[in-house]
Swiss-Prot record:
Aquaporins contain two tandem repeats each containing three membrane-spanning domains and a pore-forming loop with the signature motif Asn-Pro-Ala (NPA). It comes from Zea mays (Maize). This is Aquaporin TIP4-4. The gene is TIP4-4. Keywords: Membrane, Repeat, Transmembrane, Transmembrane helix, Transport, Vacuole. It is found in: Vacuole membrane. One of its GO terms (molecular function) is water channel activity.
Length: 252
């Protein structure tokens, strides 16, 4: 069941909130700069044709590393969301107010746009900023489903390895979240582009002026993210610890 907390406009004047919003802007800027930059670099090295197994692997690795580092860097300041789907996935269970969520999303979109503007300036002689696009033969509804499933897995991992106080991974949560992102890029990249992040798609689309099927990269993640939060919070968060396996000398 959703547990939305509305919040209040006074949050905007709170020093902690201001720092958190600024952190989201900077973290998202750095994430998108590395993520989109890696796609541009693979395309440049491949002579404009970066859609290869090697190119996909390189982009997946770049996203794995930058997500792990940026989430870790921002965890103690803003939560290290860098993604509107993560923000709304946490808002759905009352872990962040809707007012602060709106500030986070605005900062994430601005950070993404600034990163892409800088990349476009740096790569002025090349083909421009790449945008997410559906693969050949993949319709919009299939794209939405793919993005929803990929984002569901991302948010499920966020809850299990970062949010859940019973997590057994210590400080490895951000790394594990990064690994899920990388795996999802490998799995979904050829089909939907594996965005999982409306901000990651918004900046390139705005700077490039290409909006074909852009709605897919909002609808899919914003279905999958909150749904994962509600499922994990409702089924697993409130439950007690798991039953330990019986030892060899234990009678059944």
């Amino acid at each position: 069941m959703a547990k939305f907390a509305l919040g209040h406009h006074r949050e905007a004047s709170d020093a902690g909130c201001v720092r958190a919003v600024l952190a989201e802007l900077i973290l998202t800027f750095l994430f998108v700069f590395a993520g989109v930059g890696s796609a541009m670099a693979t395309g440049k090295l491949a002579g404009g044709g970066g859609d290869t197994v090697v190119g996909l692997t390189a982009v997946a690795l770049a996203h794995t590393l930058v997500v792990a580092v940026m989430v870790s860097a921002g965890l103690h300041v803003s939560g290290g969301h860098i993604n509107p789907a993560v923000t709304l996935g946490l808002a759905a269970t009352g872990r962040i107010t809707l007012f602060r969520s709106a500030l986070y999303v605005a900062a994430q979109l601005l950070g993404s746009t600034l990163a892409c503007l800088l990349l476009a300036f740096l790569a002025v002689a090349d083909s421009g900023v790449p945008v997410h696009a559906l693969g050949a033969g993949v319709g919009a509804l299939r794209g939405v489903l793919m993005e929803a499933v990929l984002t569901f897995s991302l948010l499920f991992a966020v809850y299990a390895t970062v949010v859940d106080p019973r997590r057994a991974v210590g400080g490895m949560g951000p790394l594990l979240v990064g690994l899920v992102v990388g795996a999802n890029v490998l799995a979904g990249g050829p089909f939907s582009g594996a965005s999982m992040n409306p901000a990651r798609s918004f900046g390139p689309a705005l700077v490039a002026g290409v909006w074909a099927d852009h709605w897919v990269y909002w609808v899919g993640p914003l279905i999958g993210g909150p749904l994962a939060g509600l499922v994990y919070d409702g089924l697993f968060m409130a439950q007690g610890g798991h039953e330990p396996l019986p030892r060899d000398d234990t009678d059944f």
